């Protein structure tokens, strides 16, 4: 039986005891011990829980390390009257990432399983967990022209799964109105938001339709078409255009997402995610039999001959402001190449490998994304199989 009791920060977690007489008597530590963040401020609202292992340092019997569900805590004075535990995880957090967005001139925002996601000034610094405390998140979108407006989705059968913020994550609002006519709880899936931030989109994970709202989730309308779409993205310039993809089709909308038309020329696979070119209208990249590119709002696509295979694509900052954006892919240029992370600085004409065969990180995992940084040239992020978000930098 699991018994959870209050810890010093008011959160409920495991009970911890010490004995100094070989186990004849035990002293509860929860009302005596102290806890600190160890410089990782998001942990201040968490507890030590799901403890699976503890180890005393054989060279220093005052020091003990405790494995918790959120990382590792260490105490250097376990035998004192008021021992202090501090968070000791430095980059070993085992998280399942679902998406990450690099805001041009702004922050880095992610969504993950279990712990909402993070808001960071840079990848090198510890960020803060979303204060929504909503749990597992599966989708994230940020308005291209109103970058303080973010939407995300997740939740479960017990809790409505759509959230939004109008102030860059300072305050999150949970939308409790279901888009379903039945009123049943909607959760999971993917989200999008128009470039001006005025229209929210949601393709719940427990439904096959796309819904949109013009009043921040107070009411929802079902889109016509786009059935089965689980990836949605809005044009970064023209709010009339919205793009969507399912496991078997690509769709585009010319009326702001009210109706979707299927593009009949593409063969797609379930995990493929469309990507739009930053600051450009109508330029869409889509993994399909290699990498496909559209310059007419998704109506027609042209395959890049320079790639034999592409499972994910992302765009990042160019070398200078006048240079085109960089393109990152998970795939391979020729059939003789190995699958991995590649990048192009010339709009896909030539490719250079970023990863190596010893560092594949299990592939793209649940999130199935490759994302370029919009503020640092040469930086790229990729999802993994339970290893968090991995990033790489160009070595000058």
Each model region followed by its residue ranges:
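Blade-level signature of beta-propeller repeat domains, shared across WD40, Kelch, NHL, RCC1
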Residues: 363-396
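Short glycine/acidic-enriched loop and turn motifs that connect beta-strands
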Residues: 9-12, 72-73, 116, 156-159, ...
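Beta-propeller fold detector
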Residues: 27-33, 84-89, 129-130, 173-177, ...
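Conserved blade-ending motifs and adjacent loop-strand segments that build the rim/top face
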Residues: 36-42, 88-98, 134-137, 305-314, ...
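Loop/turn-rich, solvent-exposed surfaces of beta-rich toroidal or solenoidal domains
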Residues: 6, 50-62, 67-72, 278-280, ...
